[in-house]
């Protein structure tokens, strides 16, 4: 009667993650400035976007300037990109299907567009 213990173990292993985890665990993996904001919609949504707002990350593997490009959007508005110097690991994680999330962290009016918005990227476990 090895079938029952094997079946029970299989069932527990299948159900354990959903039983043990009632909420998602988010791990901060990256904090970056927003690249290219001067070319996109940031100025038109500046008064509406707030620190803590959820940002959408979209991979652009066919981007002619950067095969690791990750676009950053807020409510359907493209704000810019994850900086090229910081996007390789994030692009690889997204390509693997890892769950990631981004949120605006800090915003300030500044002449230098690289200092206007900082955002954080989390991996969801």
Residue ranges of each PLM-predicted region?
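Conserved active-site motif detector
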Residues: 2-11, 18-125
